[in-house]
Design a protein with these regions (language model features):
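Short, solvent-exposed amphipathic alpha-helices that sit
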Residues: 119-123, 147-159, 210-221
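Surface-exposed cleft-lining segments at the edges of enzyme active sites
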Residues: 105-112, 144, 171
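A non-catalytic structural micro-motif
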Residues: 134-136, 156-174, 220-240
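Bacterial N-terminal signal peptides
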Residues: 9-16
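Extended hydrophobic blocks
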Residues: 20-98, 183-284
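Histidine-anchored nucleotide/phosphate-binding helix
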Residues: 113-131
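Bacterial N-terminal signal peptides that target proteins for export
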Residues: 1-8
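N-terminal nucleotide-binding beta1-loop-alpha1 segment
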Residues: 97-105
Length: 284
């Protein structure tokens, strides 16, 4: 009897261990991929590759998707050309192009900060360069004392006041982060603007790699999961500026928070955004 109990206990323990191992999901692996790269950058390439292989074994479609996303993440932080003040020549000159202007936190009273106006000035120049492109202004309510005022609507009003034709304007005014900008913008473009095949990002110079990453990753993920048409980030135009809150040596941290938010790991994303010193980093 005693030996039978021991055997039964061993079997139950093995089942518990197996159950715990089986509980690891594809989303868990993707979270690890993001965190390893976000914490260690290229030093974690070997570990990230192992995780991508693990993900592919679990889900071939998502494995291929995330390999492409990680290649793009490396690209934006090393080789992405950032074009100041205007878009490059040679982009599509028809309505397949959408110029996406990323919002920036409003003043407490709802007025726009100088940095946001700078982005809009660049966007207006881009709209004149490509007169057949639509212009999407994206950003939600970030004014502490005027929550009814949104970045997207304020930006759109500014563009109209400075000569943009109303039929070219698209407003997305529910997003509070760059990750939400990307996801909400795709929904609008996919459902209401079937001619759009590519986007050009307009933002501050330090934010272009970050914004391009989250938009391309968000667009890729949305199209892959829905089995719908792909929209690509093909270029950018930057308002040249710096920002003490978003220092160059910390941009990987903010990118990581955005990527985690994009996959629905909001609590972990908030740690990277606002409590980075206490983030429990994975061991390399």
């Amino acid at each position: 009897m005693k030996s039978s109990v021991i055997v039964l206990g061993s079997v139950l323990l093995a089942l518990v261990c197996f159950s715990g191992a089986a509980a690891r999901t594809a989303d868990d692996v993707i979270e690890d991929i993001i965190e390893y790269h976000g914490c260690y950058d290229r030093e974690a390439d070997e570990k990230v590759d192992e995780l991508l292989t693990e993900l592919t074994d679990m889900d071939e479609r998502r494995g291929a998707l995330w390999r492409d996303i990680m290649d793009y993440w490396d690209y934006v932080n090393s080789d992405l050309p950032v074009h100041e003040n205007r878009l490059p020549n040679g982009l599509p000159d028809d309505d397949s192009l959408c110029i996406v202007v990323l919002g920036f936190e409003l003043n407490d009273d709802g007025s726009m900060k100088e940095e946001l106006i700078g982005r809009l000035q660049v966007a207006l120049a881009c709209a004149r360069q490509y007169p057949n492109a639509c212009v999407l202004c994206t950003g939600g309510g970030t004014a502490a004392d005027a929550p009814e005022i949104t970045e997207g609507r304020s930006m759109g009003d500014w563009m109209l006041a400075h000569g943009l034709s109303p039929h070219r304007l698209i407003v997305e005014d529910r997003s509070l982060t760059t990750a939400e900008n990307a996801m909400n913008s795709y929904r609008i473009l996919f459902s209401d603007y079937p001619s759009v095949e590519s986007v050009a990002i307009v933002s501050s110079s330090y934010h272009i790699p970050w914004g391009s990453l989250l938009f391309e990753a968000g667009l890729m993920t949305s199209a892959s999961e829905r089995g719908t048409r792909r929209i690509n980030v093909i270029s950018n135009a930057a308002y040249p500026t710096t920002n003490d809150t978003y220092r160059e040596d910390e941009l990987l941290r903010w990118q990581t928070g955005g990527m985690l938010q994009m996959i629905g790991r909001n609590e972990k994303a908030l740690e990277y955004y606002f409590d980075y010193e206490n983030v429990k980093k994975p061991v390399l």
